[in-house]
């Protein structure tokens, strides 16, 4: 190998190492720490999936991780009834309301805007999996400032690499799973996992601990 070729190879290896050692994603928490919201209003999630159950399935799952993180969460049923009483029945219309108006109506410090991007079971040639993917933004309802954004995904096939039974067995298993999953809304428990990953505090890019948590202010 010539000297020039060796230099080129070393250069490529150096670039590869630099790419592989790229800095992990970071989040700017300065506005979040300045606002320090105590209460959160969860808006009905926007649904970009074809499954109509996605909005309320996800909505019913988010209170727990938020409460565990140390926030007061406005009661979901009361919020839903208030929107309906005022003629607001679709997530798109609700998401379009000015943040200051939401603060005026509910008195919450921040609003959580969620979008469900994937929800439900998909059938492929030799597998069938249930996936829920969602993104979220936490917005200061007094100023309209975005305090935090995040996303998460969960799948029923995580860690499942078994292929016992051959091709025919895999096809039958996938078909049976598809029937069971679509008839029982298998997306609901997966949405719970997604919401935990999305909204649990203490993660590197997750929500900060709220004032009701003993870990408040440690992050």
Locate the predicted segments by residue.
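C-terminal motif of bacterial Sec signal peptides marking the signal peptidase cleavage site
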Residues: 17-20
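Bacterial N-terminal signal peptides that target proteins for export
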Residues: 1-10
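Surface-exposed short loop/turn segments
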Residues: 91-147, 157-162, 166-169, 212-219
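Solvent-exposed loop/turn segments at secondary-structure junctions
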Residues: 47-50, 79-83, 117-122, 153-157
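C-terminal/domain-edge helix-coil "capping" segments
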Residues: 22-38, 141-219
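Post-signal peptide N-terminal segment of mature Sec-exported envelope proteins
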Residues: 30-53
């Amino acid at each position: 190998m010539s000297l020039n070729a060796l230099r080129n190879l070393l250069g490529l290896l150096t670039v590869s190492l630099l790419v592989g050692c790229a800095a992990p994603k970071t989040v700017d928490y300065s506005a979040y720490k300045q606002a320090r919201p105590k209460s959160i209003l969860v808006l009905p999630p926007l649904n970009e999936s074809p499954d109509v159950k996605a909005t309320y399935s996800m909505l019913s799952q988010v209170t727990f991780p938020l409460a565990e993180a140390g926030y007061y969460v406005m009661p979901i049923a009361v919020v839903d009834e208030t929107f309906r009483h005022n003629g607001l029945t679709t997530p798109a219309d609700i998401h379009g309301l000015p943040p200051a108006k939401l603060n005026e109506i509910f008195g919450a410090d921040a609003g959580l805007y969620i979008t469900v991007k994937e929800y439900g079971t998909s059938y492929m040639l030799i597998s069938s999996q249930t996936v829920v993917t969602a993104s979220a933004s936490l917005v200061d309802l007094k100023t309209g400032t975005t305090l935090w954004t995040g996303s998460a995904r969960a799948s029923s096939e995580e860690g499942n690499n078994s292929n016992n039974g051959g091709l025919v067995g895999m096809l039958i298993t996938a078909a049976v799973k598809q029937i069971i999953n679509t008839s029982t809304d298998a997306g609901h428990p997966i949405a719970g996992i997604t919401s935990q990953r999305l909204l649990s505090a203490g993660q590197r890019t997750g929500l900060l601990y709220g004032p009701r948590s003993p870990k408040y202010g440690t992050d």
